[in-house]
Amino acid sequence: MISQVRGTIMHRELDRVEIMTASGVAYECLIPLSVFESLPSEGQTVTLHTHLVVREDAWHLYGFAHAYERAVFQKLLHAKGVGPALALGILSALTPDRVVRALHEKDVLTLMRVPRVGRKKAEQIILDLADKIDAVGPAPATGTAPSPLGDDAVRALIALGYNQTEADRAVRAVVESGAPKDVSSLVRGALSRLTAK
């Protein structure tokens, strides 16, 4: 089992990255959008936690920034009708901790934000995983715990057209810079960061 790959980024795309290891072997890892956004530039060193899927016709290596994110991916594979491509799509649309919270809270609507996940599929994922998701362990420390205030702000940004990943990231940055008193000020702060890009 290949559980981790460390090396130099040779090439990267939205859904994959090619890494040349010190031994001279290059690995192509399929990645969620959140990993692509956090990758250093080509020529820089990166370490990814990986999961290998072996099929009769191909071997695919999936790469993640944290072991926790990989654990959520692996747990998603235990849901009926969820293969590696859909599990990767879920982690491209939602952060790992948001996936875990959605499962704990049986939040069908959050899972339905993911392309190719309708109500029936979301309900099936929750049915299969809601009682098992604790096995992935705690999320890595980020300095800021999720809050109802932050969740409301993220929902507001998504309603304005931003995706889950960028909304989560902007809201977390505002919270870390100083706790806002209400949702509207948090949304305004997040919007100023998003529009400044």
UniProtKB/Swiss-Prot annotation:
Full protein name: Holliday junction branch migration complex subunit RuvA
Region: Domain II, residue numbers: 66-140
Family of this protein: Belongs to the RuvA family.
Domain of life: Bacteria
Example GO BP: DNA recombination
Location of region: Flexible linker: 140-144
Region (Domain III): 145-197
Keyword Lipoprotein annotated: no
Subunit structure, as described in the record: Homotetramer. Forms an RuvA(8)-RuvB(12)-Holliday junction (HJ) complex. HJ DNA is sandwiched between 2 RuvA tetramers; dsDNA enters through RuvA and exits via RuvB. An RuvB hexamer assembles on each DNA strand where it exits the tetramer. Each RuvB hexamer is contacted by two RuvA subunits (via domain III) on 2 adjacent RuvB subunits; this complex drives branch migration. In the full resolvosome a probable DNA-RuvA(4)-RuvB(12)-RuvC(2) complex forms which resolves the HJ.
Pfam families noted in UniProt: HHH_5 (PF14520), RuvA_C (PF07499), RuvA_N (PF01330)
Record's comment describing the protein's domains: Has three domains with a flexible linker between the domains II and III and assumes an 'L' shape. Domain III is highly mobile and contacts RuvB.
